[in-house]
Amino acid sequence: IQDEQRSFQRILLESEPDKRDKGYAWHTAIGLQAVDGLKTSDYLVHTAVRNIEGEISFEEANALLQTYYEENPARDAEDRTEEADKVAARIAALLSERAFSFTPNEYLSIHRKLFTGIYPHAGRIRDYNITKKEWVLNGATVLYGSATELRATLEYDFSEEKKFSYKNLSMDEIIHHLAVFISRLWQIHVFGEGNTI
């Protein structure tokens, strides 16, 4: 497996554009799992390398992961490796697509694509109020958007972002603005789980 991880790193550094693009998509997808404290499996890395090398498609990678976890179910309810692997593969596939529309419906669709079969509420706006203790805030409790106003709040934030002009902004200003927009989406917390996509 370490050879596959080295191969994965090599692809990011020295391959042709198509392989490099897939490599970055997989690297990003795996990294996003780590942000949520999830660890992907060695099997996922092996599958990713096969996809990057052109041996299998994203659809085949997803099918292989599905079969792998049907044959090797988690023995511990706390083990979220299957979730990490499946979501990482779906993120890599989404990042490799060229079509995208910046709308609340697309946002809901992305959640549905990533979490179908993992969360029963995949792609659906939550219909209940929540508070959560967040590790990123040292366990402080966060109040999220009210369930009755989630759709309207989401549409408002997207419409405000669409109006914003990035013209003549420095990279630091762009990063700051995007961070504020993303933090607003997280504060809305439109889904019961899976909001940090």
What residues fall within each predicted segment?
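FIC/Doc superfamily catalytic core
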Residues: 1-197
